[in-house]
């Protein structure tokens, strides 16, 4: 680290501690040449994620916008705000861990639906209706049928194996 006083490039760390709720590390340093003491901060640098909208426009990932959409879908469902915040944290973390720097709004919508399916059927259908741009009752019925079939699959995973076996034997 370069000394701000004499520009010498060697320094030693006297003290390190976590700061800003664990989001950075504060280091107290001393220049090896002039003995000047100074403080540096080390922070995580997140690579920005670009969201490709349905119309092809590109915009920066907006965590607040995602949270607003999820909160809206979960109104009056009893899901605590801390859980909604955790869902957004998980989604953002998954996006940051992916090597892609561009993601479609459809991919983000699918991630949200994965989480909401586990939390609340009502929130799932509400979010799906906006995300899927539902036009009428048939769209709602299709979403409910999909939700119901996945519930049956989760409750009775062997049923799909029985169905597969009957299809295989009837061929």
Curated annotation (Swiss-Prot):
Zinc finger intervals, unnamed: 3-34
Annotated InterPro entries: ATP-cone_dom, NrdR-like_N, RNR_NrdR-like
Domain of life: Bacteria
One function term, GO molecular function aspect: DNA binding
UniProt GO BP: negative regulation of DNA-templated transcription
Cofactor(s) needed: Zn(2+)
Details of cofactor binding: Binds 1 zinc ion.
Key words of the record: ATP-binding, DNA-binding, Metal-binding, Nucleotide-binding, Repressor, Transcription, Transcription regulation, Zinc, Zinc-finger
Region (Disordered): 1-21
Biased composition (Basic and acidic residues): 7-18
Alphabetized Pfam families for the sequence: ATP-cone, Zn_ribbon_NrdR
Keyword Repressor: yes
ATP-cone domain location: 49-139
Family (UniProt): Belongs to the NrdR family.
HAMAP family per the UniProt record, alphabetical: NrdR
Protein role: Negatively regulates transcription of bacterial ribonucleotide reductase nrd genes and operons by binding to NrdR-boxes.
Name of the protein described by the UniProt record: Transcriptional repressor NrdR
Name of encoding gene: nrdR
């Amino acid at each position: 680290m370069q000394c701000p006083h004499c520009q010498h490039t060697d320094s030693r760390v006297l003290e390190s501690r976590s700061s800003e709720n664990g989001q950075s590390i504060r280091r107290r340093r001393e220049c090896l040449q002039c003995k000047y003491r100074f403080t540096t901060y080390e922070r995580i640098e997140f690579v920005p994620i670009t969201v490709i909208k349905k119309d092809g426009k590109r915009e920066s990932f907006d965590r607040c916008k995602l949270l607003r959409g999820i909160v809206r879908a979960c109104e009056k469902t009893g899901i605590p705000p801390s859980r909604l915040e955790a869902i957004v944290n998980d989604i953002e973390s998954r996006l940051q861990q992916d090597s892609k720097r561009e993601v479609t709004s459809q991919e983000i919508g699918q991630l949200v639906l994965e989480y909401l399916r586990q939390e609340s059927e009502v929130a799932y259908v509400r979010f799906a209706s906006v995300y899927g741009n539902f036009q009428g009752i048939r769209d709602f019925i299709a979403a409910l049928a999909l939700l119901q079939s996945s519930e049956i699959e989760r409750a009775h995973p062997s049923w799909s194996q029985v169905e597969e076996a009957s299809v295989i034997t009837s061929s």
